[in-house]
Amino acid sequence: LPTLSHEAFGDIYLFEGELPNTLTTSNNNQLSLSKQHAKDGEQSLKWQYQPQATLTLNNIVNYQDDKNTATPLTFMMWIYNEKPQSSPLTLAFKQNNKIALSFNAELNFTGWRGIAVPFRDMQGSATGQLDQLVITAPNQAGTLFFDQIIMSVPLDNRWAVPDYQTPYVNNAVNTMVSKNWSALLMYDQMFQAHYPTLNFDTEFRDDQTEMASIYQRFEYYQGIRSDKKITPDMLDKHLALWEKLVLTQHADGSITGKALDHPNRQHFMKVEGVFSEGTQKALLDANMLRDVGKTLLQTAIYLRSDSLSATDRKKLEERYLLGTRYVLEQGFTRGSGYQIITHVGYQTRELFDAWFIGRHVLAKNNLLAPTQQAMMWYNATGRIFEKNNEIVDANVDILNTQLQWMIKSLLMLPDYQQRQQALAQLQSWLNKTILSSKGVAGGFKSDGSIFHHSQHYPAYAKDAFGGLAPSVYALSDSPFRLSTSAHERLKDVLLKMRIYTKETQIPVVLSGRHPTGLHKIGIAPFKWMALAGTPDGKQKLDTTLSAAYAKLDNKTHFEGINAESEPVGAWAMNYASMAIQRRASTQSPQQSWLAIARGFSRYLVGNESYENNNRYGRYLQYGQLEIIPADLTQSGFSHAGWDWNRYPGTTTIHLPYNELEAKLNQLPAAGIEEMLLSTESYSGANTLNNNSMFAMKLHGHSKYQQQSLRANKSYFLFDNRVIALGSGIENDDKQHTTETTLFQFAVPKLQSVIINGKKVNQLDTQLTLNNADTLIDPTGNLYKLTKGQTVKFSYQKQHSLDDRNSKPTEQLFATAVISHGKAPSNENYEYAIAIEAQNNKAPEYTVLQHNDQLHAVKDKITQEEGYAFFEATKLKSADATLLSSDAPVMVMAKIQNQQLTLSIVNPDLNLYQGREKDQFDDKGNQIEVSVYSRHWLTAESQSTNSTITVKGIWKLTTPQPGVIIKHHNNNTLITTTTIQATPTVINLVK
């Protein structure tokens, strides 16, 4: 490896060969290459300096940054300090022998520290060619070691962070979406404001009455057992892991070994065209933080065993202390931003658990303070002092990767009073956080949705509970337990997770950017939340959660509680723009099928696409109706061969994949991604008597010249019967066909579809149907169409592209779509589905109205009615209970024995009113914006009022807040107030 390498954006010093001739130093200051310390390779630059001495690097840097660049050019280096200094190192870039840009780096540390300073954060202003970097020593003589000096490199604007060495760097991170990773200094200062000093000069004990259970429960969760038998073979294998790390402790106490690193810090090194292959290889040669953590954790667990001999215990303890000191010396310590620290929580859990489990060993060896401080710093524990009015969301990344270790960092404080006060503050913060989720900000919504990336996101929800459930369990038998309302919210959200998933599998319509059919929710959180007891704290076991856990884990019972049957019922979750319906299978009553209808709106994004995820997912929420069979093995989804234009139930323009593929931009306040919003506010669900409905106004996006695509869509679900209506289907695309997909079903075993009574499973079958046809898919769901609609059916090998990498995929599929032709105008559709149809019987129903203003139906068996008012309108049907609505609402109604039950909701979350000017161009077309940049991201839902008119004179059975009844012309006017798109159920009598 060279000492100096010339790279695309600037030179880099690796110091592996001879002393380079580009370096000069002022008199009497010694420069040499040293093997004492190194961050890469085996050598670093050793500078023995006198006060105010200078070291000059004669390298040209071409500095030119766009004002709003997402990857500002950045200077990076690693410094090893043997002795803390009170005055800083000054670094100045010169242009024509004059200082153009400069900055300070504090030297108040020992060991390694990395600095990353964007040129735009330096003092001064300059562009163009910079000729020299002059480093000026502090006021006292000393020795510093430098390595991996990168003169200039593009770095994502979210990654450089302020820390103790360079507190002025990139203070924008304090308000970024990613602040939980990067605003470590801000959170550290919050903690310091309340605890200027922490007392480590006292004996560490963890057996005090009101806290002992927290330590015990965390250790029970982690499987710590003193009776664990450690065999000689286990010990040998474990010690071999330490040999692999090649760590050497020297007489002066310093430790050499490969650099300690983590994947997200290495990301910038892997960007194509930034570093040559040799340089990249040198930079990436490291001990990974997570691997070191895993080895330390196993050592800590072994050290808790009573079966160790004194000799073996000594061996393990030496390794444990060596590994801990190595991590700290590498710069992974309080106050250090480690150059880049984003997403490090995914790499640290084992390390921090190792320190928590080995806390008594650390205390005995004077390492409790630095390890506790590092845990507190990297988990941003200081956020427990966030002001109440600033807590507007719950970030699942925090709950998953930081919360547990925030708590454990406080449990490692030896001063009992400080620990007690800090835990009480954490309790208050956690209660508030769980109950705060404004607008489309992250966290736990009142309807059971769990938000991340400003949308209901089960893939992240499972991770949130992965970290949250053990924490709730650990705290629940102590004075620091959750409040009843916070615990209740978590229980509700967790129980909902097993409603909208099937045997832990996340439906495709809820898959976010992972439409692979492979993602599942975790089961363990149900166990730990069950063992945390009831929300009111009165019972040590939550039996509802126990029954759910037993079912999900395929056990007959758990803690003496029998497993539940799979859920049945209907649910409206309007923060997810979603209706859910489940019924027990006729073949297997313990199991239930799952139907989910879902849309999107001007508040809720319709897709999330990244460079290597969900490239073709634009239509995912265009009114999809996903039906998952009671027997999950019969599912019709296959990632291979799937036509991304044809999610079941969606109305779409069928495009070639090169046109359907997401064209990614980096928008202000966002990463490189696509998350498109609609212009419409009407999308959501309603329920009554365990039946449901869903409706939406669909509008395509002008980013892809699809602003002319519109449709009003609805589903009405009564038991196993679904009535699907569409109207106002239009667009001006004359090149491609518009279609509504009935089903797309993988048939790898040539499973049959029954069409008008005849079995079809012959490959390359292509049919055009247009006569009130009946189709039955391979799981027995019957689709019945009304006359006058053209259905295209195919049974063939289907070729597609992988959504992650565009590689070709294929599978056999049976597919049926209603064709609306090219550039349709005011088209509509009507079909019904009998899920698990009995005796090939189609649903019986009456359409009360089917036009652009209103979709309304009546189910024959239940006599229930459903109304999707897309706008204010009157009804013309003699069979309808309703006469009109003065606003866009959804209503479900049932008359029985002189009683009328209504469920009314306006699905508009109403987070803002009117149109946002910056979302439209001067022609009125929608502009792509990031939801993260919206001022209404954390807005409160505002109430909306609507009045419906019902035939006849009706009165409330009991007075109801927010419901006003008036009578006019022998009819009843009912005014309701909707907030957060939550349905209002009203009971009336004649």
UniProtKB/Swiss-Prot annotation:
Record annotation: effect of changing E608A: Loss of activity on both chondroitin 6-sulfate and dermatan sulfate
EC number: 4.2.2.21
EC class of the enzyme, as a word: lyase
Domain of life of the source: Bacteria
Residues the UniProt record annotates as site (Transition state stabilizer): R513
Temperature dependence: Optimum temperature is 40 degrees Celsius. Optimum temperature is 37 degrees Celsius.
Catalytic activity field: Exolytic removal of Delta(4)-unsaturated disaccharide residues from the non-reducing ends of both polymeric chondroitin/dermatan sulfates and their oligosaccharide fragments
Pfam families from the UniProt entry: Lyase_8, Lyase_8_C, Lyase_catalyt, Lyase_N
InterPro entries assigned: Chondroitin_ABC_lyase, Chondroitin_lyas, Chondroitinase_ABC_I, Gal_mutarotase_sf_dom, Galactose-bd-like_sf, GH-type_carb-bd, Lyase_8-like_C, Lyase_8_C
Keyword Lyase included in the entry's annotation: yes
Feature type site, description Important for catalytic activity: E608
pH dependence: Optimum pH is 8.
Keywords from the UniProt entry: Carbohydrate metabolism, Lyase
Annotated GO MF terms: carbohydrate binding; chondroitin-sulfate-ABC endolyase activity; chondroitin-sulfate-ABC exolyase activity
One CC-aspect GO term: extracellular region
GO BP terms, alphabetized: carbohydrate metabolic process; glycosaminoglycan catabolic process
Claim: Disulfide bond is one of the keywords in the record: no
Active site positions: H453, Y460
Mechanisms controlling activity: Inhibited by Zn(2+), whereas Ni(2+), Fe(2+), and Cu(2+) have little or no effect on activity.
Family (UniProt): Belongs to the polysaccharide lyase 8 family.
Function: Broad-specificity glycosaminoglycan lyase, which acts in an exolytic fashion, and preferentially degrades the tetra- and hexasaccharide derivatives of chondroitin sulfate and dermatan sulfate produced by the chondroitin sulfate ABC endolyase, to yield the respective disaccharides. To a lesser extent, is also able to split off disaccharide residues directly from polymeric chondroitin 4- and 6-sulfate, dermatan sulfate, chondroitin, and hyaluronan. Is not active against keratan sulfate, heparan sulfate, and heparin.
Name assigned to this protein: Chondroitin sulfate ABC exolyase
Protein species of origin: Proteus vulgaris
